């Protein structure tokens, strides 16, 4: 099996001598799209994420790309798969909230699922298809469609139609009857006044063992993670929230991260490698630099889309959430903070003609 390098070995292989303008150069004007990061060592990660990590590790919720006219760009969606394999992640998740899910049509969702199933065929990453819908019947229909594509896992946020945990039970048990594949329960609270109780999750996982995968994001999130980790019914517990608390969540025992982070996938991969090497100093340092960028995204709407375009992952920065024109001051701030991550940035693969 290909050797797994520690974070320190990886950085050494990447030639961690030059820091600063040699990587990113001067801040570009609005609309610039290419970046010249460091070369990627061939042996950064083992060849089979599914076999080695066993549904552990980094599961990236793919962002949804759009053409200049606002149509879903299926070519860029497929290219994102190539980028994420190159970056060293373990799983692909789509479509969820970070994918612009509420703004996608049924036809776009189904065609996007088909696109990703084809693009990921023969690759080492696990494919996780999001099948949540507002009501149980619609969710079951989408889950049956997804099942035919043979993903490695499905994920579902709870329903928006209903009034009690009994409605949640009907929803998730119905999904469990559609597939025998692992199902990730995302604990986003969708029904006002309905608490997604951990005991309820344990009951579901006891009855349907393939429901024992949890993306935990309900408050109090740290207490809930602690209540789930190590329980015999629970197969995996995943961190969320853009990785904002990932370092602490790792200490609590989570099995990975599920979040929208395509623009930082290589950096989170470096953080995961440091964790696997038990190098908590590097975990802290990488996470601290990531937090600066995550804060920058909160301060500057549109920064995430800018970075997807800036790094060459997407061909446009188009969004369906309203167009944002960044000022040069905002671009300068994004670029300044991005330089803090340069030791971990990998080159985005060239697009095939």
Where are these regions (language model features)?
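N-terminal export signals
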Residues: 2-4, 9-32
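Structured C-terminal cap/extension of enzyme domains
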Residues: 20, 85, 248-353
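C-terminal segment of N-terminal export signals and the immediately downstream linker at the start
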Residues: 25-61, 67, 71
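Active-site beta->alpha loop and helix N-cap motifs at the rims of alpha/beta catalytic domains
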Residues: 52, 56, 65-66, 71-193
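Conserved residues at the C-terminal ends of beta-strands
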Residues: 61, 95, 157, 217, ...
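A general structural signal for well-ordered alpha-helical segments in protein cores
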Residues: 77, 109, 113, 139, ...
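Short helix-capping segments at alpha-helix termini
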Residues: 119-125, 149-150, 179-181, 206-210, ...
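Catalytic alpha/beta core domains of metabolic enzymes, predominantly
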Residues: 190-288
């Amino acid at each position: 099996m290909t050797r797994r390098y520690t974070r320190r070995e990886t950085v050494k292989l990447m030639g961690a001598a030059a820091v600063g303008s040699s990587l990113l150069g001067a801040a570009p004007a609005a609309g610039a799209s290419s970046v010249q990061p460091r070369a990627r060592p061939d042996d950064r990660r083992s060849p089979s994420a599914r076999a080695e990590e066993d549904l552990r590790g980094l599961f990236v919720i793919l962002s949804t790309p759009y053409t200049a006219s606002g149509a879903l760009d299926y070519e860029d969606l497929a290219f994102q798969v190539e980028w994420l394999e190159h970056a060293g992640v373990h799983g692909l998740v789509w479509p969820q909230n970070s994918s612009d899910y509420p703004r996608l049509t049924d036809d776009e969702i189904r065609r996007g699922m088909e696109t990703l199933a084809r693009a990921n065929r023969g690759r080492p990453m696990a494919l996780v298809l999001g099948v949540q819908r507002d009501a149980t019947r619609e969710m079951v229909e989408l889950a049956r469609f997804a099942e035919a594509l043979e993903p490695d896992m499905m994920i579902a946020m709870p329903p928006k139609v209903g009034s009690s945990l009994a409605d949640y039970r009907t929803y998730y048990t119905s999904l469990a009857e559609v597939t025998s594949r692992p199902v990730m329960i995302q604990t986003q609270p969708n029904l006002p006044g309905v608490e997604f109780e951990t005991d309820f999750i344990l009951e579901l996982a006891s009855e349907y063992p393939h429901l024992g995968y949890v993306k935990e994001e309900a408050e109090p999130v740290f207490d809930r993670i602690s209540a789930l980790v190590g329980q015999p019914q629970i197969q995996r517990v995943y961190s969320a929230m853009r990785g904002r608390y990932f370092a602490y969540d790792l200490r609590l025992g989570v099995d990975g991260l599920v979040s929208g982070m395509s623009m930082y996938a290589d950096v989170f991969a470096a953080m995961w490698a440091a964790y696997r090497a038990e190098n908590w100093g590097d975990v802290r340092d990488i996470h601290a630099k990531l937090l600066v960028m995550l804060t920058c995204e909160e301060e500057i709407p549109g920064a995430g889309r800018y970075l997807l375009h800036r790094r060459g992952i997407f061909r446009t920065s188009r969004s369906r959430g309203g167009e944002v024109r960044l000022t040069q001051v905002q671009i300068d701030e994004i670029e300044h903070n991005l330089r803090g991550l340069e030791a971990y940035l990998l080159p985005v693969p060239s697009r095939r003609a």
